[in-house]
């Protein structure tokens, strides 16, 4: 079973017919089957008489979608279309991308994860549970997709800012892969969501009689890492060239897993590296628009977990690329967590935090600060020009913090990136008011435009969906065997090149969602070029590379079918 290419030049030869064909989401056309196809595939009477175009189907679906009043039911409705007719699903999403992205992914996907067992309808992807650890190869062989090229995998322990959702975390790989297709043109026949079920420490789920996961506390330590290794090794055997995206693993596991496997498999961690790439791309664009480089900015983070430190490390790398030494770059980055500013004399720092700790002598001249140096202390004394929130805690960018930030620079950059919307460090409307409209803002979740003193401010969403679809497309088009730091840096610079702010100082920081497919293609090209330069992809001309990108870019159109015997 495959719908791996999408062209009307050649028909697709398939053996399925009747109800079986209608039950295959990759192949089902519903009311769009032609008269000839209805005859050849035993479909007469199984669907209504009228033959519709995909445009007509999309219009009907959108009308039905509009009948739902709340976002979670809209999400359930769209997932039902996805599970019955994937081509129609992506046509509908493409027709209304900006409207529907918040429904199929953040913020609505957060509630969908919390209620996964409540709203479960139909199978999608695979669940690999710890009790089945002796049968991993069999589980992977049960997948009918032969040519999987992109996998998003989670263990459900740190879902957005919502914590441990057990197997409910499957909503994230499903949503992410929907965006790989809708934004990056990767055929749904090439994608596979995977959830690793190692139990849950969420007592509410353990007590829930309809929770569908393994009802045990999470395994940990060597037992956990050995199981993860079994899963990843099995994936490598089944689909040796697939890109693996790690998604929403807990901080204690995310960086060790990335460190262990990034030089063995073609893989990356979107929470660490994808978030970093889109954030750095946004900062490069904002700096260029002000006639500066990123190395001229001073940056303060609220949140020093794997995501925050991942962004910080990529900022340091970009500053070094712009001419600073490593030490000079690190001196311009301040990391604040729940224990205050991270300094070198603090105990119990994680390895990835220690490299970003500020020197003790830096803060010794700050005078009247408490032993725990607060975010406000850092903003007052370090005088940052950029404030980035990845804390998962709402409201911590207070009015005093933002007003103090705005005293130090003409156009402060404020990026409250925590997801979902309920976890954002500050509301864009408040930031605009507190800075008298001077702040450049990018958020992790979508927000409506803000009207302030008669001017409408669009709020750019610093969403990883600007980055990871292009990375996936670039990896596939080039045949890259690894995801290197240079490839990630290339994605940041490609995104910065697309910023409307570079043409108009009053424009938005990031491109419109409506343009995201073109952005993904540009990112794919730069990522693929970097892969070739790093020697992890075969050498090819720019012309061939561009042809590969266009060839791989799937569009939701129906193909003609011809029947063949089994």
Swiss-Prot record:
Biological process annotations from GO: malate metabolic process
Assigned EC number: 1.1.1.38
Subunit field text: Homotetramer.
Binding site for a divalent metal cation: 247-248, 271
Name of the gene encoding the protein in the UniProt record: maeA
Entries under InterPro entries matching the protein: Aminoacid_DH-like_N_sf, Malic_enzyme_CS, Malic_N_dom, Malic_N_dom_sf, Malic_NAD-bd, Malic_OxRdtase, NAD(P)-bd_dom_sf, NAD_malic_enz_proteobac
Lineage summary: Bacteria, Pseudomonadati, Pseudomonadota, Gammaproteobacteria, Moraxellales
Binding-site residues, NAD(+): 158, 271, 419
Family classification: Belongs to the malic enzymes family.
Known cofactor(s): Mg(2+); Mn(2+)
SMART domains (alphabetical): malic, Malic_M
Pfam family, one: Malic_M
Classification via CDD domains: NAD_bind_1_malic_enz (cd05312)
Record-level GO cellular component terms: cytosol
Site (Important for activity) location in chain: 271
GO terms for MF: malate dehydrogenase (decarboxylating) (NAD+) activity; metal ion binding; NAD binding; oxaloacetate decarboxylase activity
Cofactor notes: Divalent metal cations. Prefers magnesium or manganese.
Designated name of the protein: NAD-dependent malic enzyme
Organism: Acinetobacter baylyi (strain ATCC 33305 / BD413 / ADP1)
Entry keywords, A to Z: Metal-binding, NAD, Oxidoreductase
Catalytic activity: (S)-malate + NAD(+) = pyruvate + CO2 + NADH; oxaloacetate + H(+) = pyruvate + CO2
């Amino acid at each position: 079973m495959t719908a791996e290419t999408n062209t009307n030049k050649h028909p697709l030869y398939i053996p399925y017919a009747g109800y079986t064909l209608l039950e295959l989401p990759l192949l089902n056309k519903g009311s769009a089957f032609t008269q000839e196809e209805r005859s050849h595939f035993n479909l007469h009477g199984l669907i209504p008489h009228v033959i519709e175009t995909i445009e007509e189907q999309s219009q009907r679906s959108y009308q039905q979608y509009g009948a739902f009043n709340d976002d979670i039911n809209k999400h359930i409705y769209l997932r039902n279309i996805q599970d019955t007719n994937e081509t129609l699903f992506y046509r509908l999403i493409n027709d209304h991308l900006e409207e529907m992205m918040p429904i199929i992914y953040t913020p609505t996907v957060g509630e969908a994860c919390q209620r996964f067992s409540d709203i479960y309808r139909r199978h999608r992807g695979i669940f690999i549970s710890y009790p089945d650890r002796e049968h991993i190869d069999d589980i992977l062989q049960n997948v009918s997709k032969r040519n999987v090229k992109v996998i998003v995998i989670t263990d459900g322990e740190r879902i957005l800012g919502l914590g441990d959702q057990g197997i409910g975390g499957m909503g994230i790989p499903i949503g992410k892969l929907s965006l790989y297709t809708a934004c990056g043109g990767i055929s749904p026949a090439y994608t596979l969501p995977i959830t690793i079920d190692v139990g849950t420490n969420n007592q509410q789920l353990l007590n829930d009689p309809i929770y569908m996961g393994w009802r045990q506390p999470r395994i940990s330590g060597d037992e956990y890492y050995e199981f993860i290794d079994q899963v990843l090794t099995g994936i490598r055997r089944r689909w040796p060239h697939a890109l693996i995206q790690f998604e929403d693993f807990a901080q204690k596991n995310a960086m060790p897993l990335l460190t262990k496997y990034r030089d063995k498999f073609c893989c990356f961690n979107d929470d660490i590296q994808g978030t970093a790439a889109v954030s750095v791309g946004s900062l490069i664009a904002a700096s260029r628009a002000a006639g500066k480089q990123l190395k001229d900015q001073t940056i303060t983070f609220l949140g020093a977990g794997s995501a925050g430190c991942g962004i910080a490390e990529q900022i340091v790398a970009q500053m070094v690329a712009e001419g600073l030494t490593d030490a000079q770059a690190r001196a311009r980055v301040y990391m604040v967590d729940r224990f205050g500013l991270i300094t070198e004399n603090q105990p119990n720092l994680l390895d990835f935090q220690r490299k970003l700790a500020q020197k003790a002598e830096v803060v010794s001249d700050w005078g009247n600060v408490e032993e725990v140096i607060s975010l406000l202390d850092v903003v007052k004394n370090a005088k940052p020009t950029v404030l980035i929130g990845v804390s998962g805690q709402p409201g911590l960018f207070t009015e005093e913090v933002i007003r103090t930030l705005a005293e130090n620079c003409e156009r402060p950059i404020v990026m409250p990136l925590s997801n979902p919307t309920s976890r954002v460090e500050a509301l864009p409307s408040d930031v605009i008011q507190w800075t008298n409209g001077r702040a450049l803002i990018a958020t992790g979740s979508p927000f409506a435009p803000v009207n302030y003193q008669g001017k409408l401010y669009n709020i750019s969403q610093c969403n990883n969906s600007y980055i990871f679809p292009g990375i996936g497309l670039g990896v596939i088009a080039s045949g890259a065997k690894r995801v290197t730091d240079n490839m990630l840096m290339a994605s940041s610079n490609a995104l910065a090149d697309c910023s409307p702010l570079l043409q108009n100082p009053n424009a938005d920081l990031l491109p419109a969602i409506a343009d995201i497919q073109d952005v993904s293609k540009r990112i794919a090209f730069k990522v693929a070029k970097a892969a070739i330069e790093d020697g992890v992809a075969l050498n090819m001309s720019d012309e061939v590379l561009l042809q590969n990108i266009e060839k791989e870019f799937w569009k939701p159109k129906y193909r003609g079918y011809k029947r063949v015997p089994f």
